[in-house]
Design a protein with these regions (language model features):
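GHKL/Histidine-kinase-like ATPase module
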Residues: 72-76, 109-237
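GHKL-type ATPase core
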Residues: 1-9, 20-146
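Pseudouridine synthase
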Residues: 13, 45, 50, 196, ...
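Generic beta-structure capping elements
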Residues: 16, 65-67, 93-95, 169-171, ...
């Protein structure tokens, strides 16, 4: 139970708005998100929403329905003398009619599939499944290889920074292109982390070209214009 709210923490996290550790400014964290809004809004826009979790000693199960209007009492059971499996499982039935749909569209399905691959690529130590099939990505390099015709054209490195992985290839768009993640959150517009790595690569590469090919006048900006950069970063925020 939560010390002050007098309710189980899973119910507080998944069934009540404005409850999340991200509200606190003190301390640093390596997570993203919007105060748990994703899970709560999923509950609100679902006909049925079930949370199951276990710490190996106790299992917890709770069900909401009717767009979070109805909340059943949680089922809490001891695992007994034998230490059980630690897990968290969220199952939901989206209220498609609320959005004017009768089935999940191909566009939404493709978006979900892309996000599943994002999760697998950023967390290679976690088994991630899509429609019951294991997404076989053993590293961020494997994930980056999905975006180029030839995986051998991708150069990868961790830069010696824990939580960072970088992959770079030539851009097929004849201009600087990129995708990136910060704390497992997709940063489609890039940002300081992308510019930092791009400049870190382009400047010395331009110098190397100038030294080995004096007749060429290549600038870092020109190198960057032919770069396809993929970055996974962990940043304390």
């Amino acid at each position: 139970l939560h010390k002050t709210e007098n309710m189980y923490i899973p119910e507080l996290i998944f069934g009540h708005l404005l409850t999340g550790s991200n509200f606190r400014d003190e301390g640093s964290r390596l997570t993203g998100g919007r105060h748990g809004y994703g899970a709560k809004l999923t509950n609100i826009f679902s006909k049925e929403f079930i949370v199951e979790t276990s710490d190996g000693k106790t299992t917890y199960r709770q069900r909401w329905c009717d767009n979070m209007r109805s909340c059943e009492e949680p089922e809490v059971r001891s695992c007994g003398d034998k230490f059980g499996e630690e897990f968290t499982r969220v199952t939901f039935v989206p209220d498609l009619e609320h959005f004017g749909d009768v089935a999940v569209s191909e566009t939404i399905l493709a978006t979900l599939r892309r996000r599943v691959y994002d999760v697998a690529g950023c967390n290679p130590d976690v088994d991630v499944f899509f429609n019951g099939e294991l997404v076989e990505l053993s590293s961020f390099a494997d994930y980056a290889g999905l975006f180029v015709k030839n995986k051998d054209d991708v150069v990868t490195t961790s830069l010696g920074i824990p939580g960072w992985d970088v992959a770079v290839s030539t851009s097929s768009e004849q201009q600087f292109s990129h995708f990136s993640f910060v704390n497992n959150m997709a940063t489609h517009r890039g940002g300081t982390h992308v510019n930092l790595i791009a400049d870190h690569i382009a400047a010395p590469l331009a110098k190397h070209i100038a030294r080995t090919n004096p007749e060429l006048n290549v600038t870092p900006a020109q190198v960057k214009a032919h770069m396809f950069l993929m970055v996974k970063a962990s940043v304390c925020i």
